[in-house]
């Protein structure tokens, strides 16, 4: 099972379902989710084990384009003040094609949303990047434009978390260059039940 996971390519899992945005890497967390769902299905346990009904992935290609278009690399290299980095990322613009894709996602999800990191280094079994990067949640209520702004902000803050002090210190400790890390993003509905105006995960 271990060697099978190491050699597993999770990208087709998302592409075949129309859950993929961009043409880059999907990162370690997204790979793990795809592998787990595939393994459960192959074992005939889909009725016993629940997963979110959709899992969208924004690949590292979008991260690279976002960084380049908004000239963010000089900022992340030029300051240790993470609040400045977060501010710059929040003010930066996502590609219009990605905004359209995010709006499409929100039209398919009517529950609260989790926006999760899936960096390429999270796929390295020799490293422990768990908890180093951001996960953001939002209630996904209101009109589409409002929800889209919330989702965009969450994606940008997950991107910014690539450069948070904890992650940067961990990479320095292990001699990992900044350019070696790239961030994909997972967007999932939060599994739970709604009772009246409340949602219970």
How does the language model describe each region?
Residues 1-186, 194-195:
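N-terminal beta-alpha lobe that positions the nucleotide/phosphoryl donor
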Residues 191:
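Extended, highly charged clamp/arch subdomains and adjacent linkers
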Residues 196-201:
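Short, intrinsically disordered, charge-balanced linker/junction segments flanking boundaries
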């Amino acid at each position: 099972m271990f060697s099978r996971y190491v050699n597993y390519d999770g990208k087709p899992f998302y592409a075949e379902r129309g859950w993929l945005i961009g043409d880059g890497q999907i990162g370690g967390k997204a790979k793990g989710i795809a592998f787990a769902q595939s393994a459960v299905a192959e074992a005939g346990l889909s009725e016993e084990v629940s997963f979110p009904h959709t899992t969208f992935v924004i690949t590292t290609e979008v991260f690279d384009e976002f960084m380049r278009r908004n000239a963010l690399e000089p900022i992340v290299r030029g300051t240790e003040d993470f609040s400045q980095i977060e501010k710059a990322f929040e003010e930066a613009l996502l590609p219009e094609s990605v905004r359209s894709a995010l709006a499409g996602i929100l039209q398919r999800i009517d529950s609260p949303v989790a926006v999760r990191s899936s960096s390429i280094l999270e796929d390295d079994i020799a490293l422990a990047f768990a908890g180093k990067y951001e996960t953001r949640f939002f209630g996904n209520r209101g009109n589409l434009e409002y929800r889209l702004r919330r989702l965009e902000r969450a994606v940008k803050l997950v991107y910014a978390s690539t450069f948070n002090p904890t992650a940067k210190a961990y990479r320095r400790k292990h001699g990992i260059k900044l350019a070696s890390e790239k961030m994909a993003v997972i967007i999932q509905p939060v599994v739970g039940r709604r009772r009246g105006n409340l949602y219970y995960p």
